[in-house]
UniProtKB/Swiss-Prot annotation:
Residues 194-209 have a biased composition (Polar residues). The keyword Protein transport applies. InterPro entries: Snf7_fam. Residues 20-60 form a coiled coil. Belongs to the SNF7 family. The gene is VPS20.1. This is Vacuolar protein sorting-associated protein 20 homolog 1. The keyword Transport applies. It holds the Pfam family Snf7. It is found in: Endosome. Keywords: Coiled coil, Endosome, Protein transport, Transport. GO terms for cellular component: endosome. Component of the ESCRT-III complex, which is required for multivesicular bodies (MVBs) formation and sorting of endosomal cargo proteins into MVBs. The ESCRT-III complex is probably involved in the concentration of MVB cargo. One of its GO terms (biological process) is vacuolar transport.
Length: 219
């Protein structure tokens, strides 16, 4: 149902001219084919007449052939002219389309520019410049460049801190005192024969010991 209300494209004078030229080109092409057939036929007739020793008729056929060839050349030129005309129309149509596009683009630019207030644009540019100047000044205060001497001191301090960290992370070297403290806490080696306690002496050992003590020493 929707197709019933579609508006047909309007045929312009350019469309009619293009259609006419294409029709003429098609007719000229058909005429070329006809002339080529006539030329070939006259050529074949001349061969046959020469074979029959009919020189006059053979020459007449060749004259007709030449006439048709000249006409074919003229038709070829007409076809070239038609093709050139079609090319010019197509090029001109494209140029017109480009011109219309440029015209619409120019109108769009003017419409956008009409919505821009020059005072607002100038104010925006001034605000942007002020903000940039403030930021540059702030960066200059917070990030002043250091002198060469300051840079050398910073590098030296960095090397010092790095060396300290390396030393701190290394395991400690044991000293003599720490080695002695780490020795096992063993008892001293006895220098005298250990004497057993009375509780550990048996009755037999006690009697023997008493007897020995009671015996007189030899004179």
């Amino acid at each position: 149902m929707g197709n019933l209300f579609v508006k047909k494209p309007q045929i312009t004078e350019v469309d009619r001219a293009i259609l006419s030229l294409k029709t003429q080109r098609r007719k000229l092409g058909q005429y070329q084919q006809k002339l080529e057939k006539v030329i070939e036929a006259e050529k074949q007739a001349a061969r046959d007449l020469i074979r029959e020793k009919r020189k006059d008729r053979a020459l007449l056929a060749l004259r007709k052939k030449r006439t048709q060839e000249e006409l074919l050349k003229q038709v070829d030129q007409w076809v070239i002219n038609v093709e050139q005309q079609l090319t010019d129309i197509e090029l001109t149509s494209k140029q017109k389309a480009v011109f219309e596009s440029l015209k619409q683009g120019n109108s769009a630019i003017k419409a956008i520019q009409s919505e821009l207030d020059l005072d607002d644009v100038q104010k925006l540019m001034d605000d942007t410049a002020d903000a940039k100047a403030y930021q540059d000044e702030l960066n200059a205060i917070l990030g002043e460049k250091l002198s060469a001497e300051d840079e050398e001191d910073i590098l030296a301090e960095f090397d010092n801190l790095e060396s300290q960290l390396i030393v701190d992370e290394m395991p400690e070297v044991p000293t003599k005192e720490s080695e002695e403290s780490e020795k096992l806490d063993l008892p001293d080696v006895p220098t005298k024969t250990p004497v057993a306690s009375n509780a550990e002496i048996t009755p037999a050992e006690s009697a023997t010991k008493t007897k020995v003590l009671e015996e007189p020493l030899p004179a």
